[in-house]
């Protein structure tokens, strides 16, 4: 086997929030580690997403005093939920049980991801932008040899642990022979940006708007206000329903834009429409191989099945992985440390994910959506719980 040019303690494929936070966590827990971070894109780069980050992401940033990257961003103060027959509820974001802050920001991923990556660069993480993952194989001494490439070069690096944080279509996951989620455990969504000079006037404040079972039956649409007049809008539906009913994602987005206009929202300059897949955490992969390779973030199907949010879970996974393995990188027990990370993540989020999956089933029924919103309109605890499923780690008891 051809030898590698550099040996890393940790090599991470994918420099989104999950991968970058994993790199940050390893360096903060042990600054002497040699950490490499690889991404096929050159940053800053766009990423299709709703762009909303809540208390979980803020808490993950605060762990290592990195919350300063959120300075000067406007805070979202409420949520507005619409259901069938125009049932609507507006509610201030409640104090969540597990976090210091009950705050939401809407920051385009082209900015947010670049800021988090720069935090990793500041810690002297070696970053390789514009390089794609090719393959890995185990060397005779149990180290991993990882090949990456760009248009001009093929490079081989050695590493003690390889982390796949390379998204819903993870190449690392594919080489591990871990199947993709079935259509039942995935959604398809489309995001666009618009300008709206009167959105804050219509909703009286900076509010996240969710529309359930209106523009997309058995799915939901969103409008999230960012800086100035900028809004992130989009719509998502379960992939199984999307295929069965032969829906058109662009038509669904247009239907939602028309709904916004019916509510009085001025919609201007629709742009940057981009569709994407969301692998839900209702079907998380089990890695049975004994090589020191693991997955985090979308590559490991960590997306909330109710909200479609994945940034927080991916960032926490990166931290938990570093916490459970940073002191085992030269130990024969490294693989046990990877197993400890999986157990820790599952213990923390399993009941939450199950509760969100059940909520998803309820919200796929227009009848049940109407009932839930009617109850919530008269019961503060119910609406608070729904919001905590979206933004915290709440679960049914």
Q: Where do the language-model regions lie?
A:
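Short beta-strand to alpha-helix junction loop
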Residues: 52, 96-118, 192, 242-248
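A conserved beta-strand/loop capping segment in the N-terminal third of enzymes
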Residues: 31, 58, 62-114
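Conserved N-terminal glycine-rich FAD pyrophosphate-binding loop of Rossmann-like flavoproteins
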Residues: 41-64
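Predominantly flavin-linked oxidoreductase catalytic cores and closely associated redox partners
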Residues: 119-263
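Glycine-rich FAD pyrophosphate-binding loop
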Residues: 11, 25-49
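FAD/FMN-dependent oxidoreductases across multiple families
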Residues: 241-324
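Beta1/beta-strand and adjacent pyrophosphate-binding region of the FAD-binding site
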Residues: 2-18, 36
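C-terminal helical "tail/cap" subdomain of flavin- and related membrane-associated enzymes
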Residues: 323-397
């Amino acid at each position: 086997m051809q030898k590698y040019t550099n040996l890393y303690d940790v090599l991470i494929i994918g420099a989104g929030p999950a991968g970058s936070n994993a790199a940050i966590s390893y360096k903060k827990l042990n600054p002497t580690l040699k950490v490499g971070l690889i991404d096929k894109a050159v940053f800053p780069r766009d990423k299709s997403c709703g762009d909303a980050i809540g208390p979980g992401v803020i808490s993950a940033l605060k762990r290592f005093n990195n919350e300063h990257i959120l300075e000067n961003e406007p805070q979202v103060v409420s949520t507005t939920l619409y259901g069938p027959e125009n049932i609507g509820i507006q509610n201030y974001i409640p104090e969540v049980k597990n976090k210091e802050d009950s705050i939401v920001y809407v920051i385009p991923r082209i900015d947010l991801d670049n800021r988090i990556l720069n935090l990793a660069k500041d810690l002297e993480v070696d970053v390789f932008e514009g390089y794609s993952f090719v393959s890995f194989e185990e060397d005779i001494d149990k180290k991993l040899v990882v090949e990456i490439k760009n248009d001009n070069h093929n490079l081989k690096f050695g590493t003690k642990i390889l982390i796949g944080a390379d998204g819903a279509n993870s190449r690392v996951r594919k080489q591990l022979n871990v199947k993709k989620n079935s259509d039942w455990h995935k959604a398809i969504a489309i995001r666009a940006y618009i300008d709206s000079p009167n959105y804050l006037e219509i909703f009286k404040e900076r509010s996240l708007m969710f529309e359930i079972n209106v523009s997309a039956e058995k799915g939901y649409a969103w409008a999230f206000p960012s800086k100035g007049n900028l809004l992130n809008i989009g719509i998502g539906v379960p992939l199984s329903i999307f295929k069965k009913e032969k829906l058109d994602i662009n038509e669904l987005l247009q239907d939602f834009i028309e709904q916004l206009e019916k509510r009085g929202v001025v919609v201007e300059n629709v742009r940057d429409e981009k569709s994407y897949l969301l692998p839900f955490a209702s079907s998380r992969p089990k890695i049975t191989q004994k090589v020191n390779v693991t997955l985090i973030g979308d590559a490991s199907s960590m997306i909330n099945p109710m909200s479609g949010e994945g940034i927080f879970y991916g960032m926490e996974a990166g931290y938990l992985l570093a916490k459970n393995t940073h002191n085992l990188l030269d130990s024969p027990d490294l693989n046990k440390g990877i197993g400890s990370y999986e157990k820790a993540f599952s213990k923390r989020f399993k009941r939450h994910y199950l509760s969100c999956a059940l909520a998803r089933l309820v919200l796929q029924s227009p009848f049940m959506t109407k009932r839930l919103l009617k109850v919530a309109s008269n019961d503060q605890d119910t609406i608070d719980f729904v919001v905590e499923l979206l933004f915290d780690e709440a679960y049914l008891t």
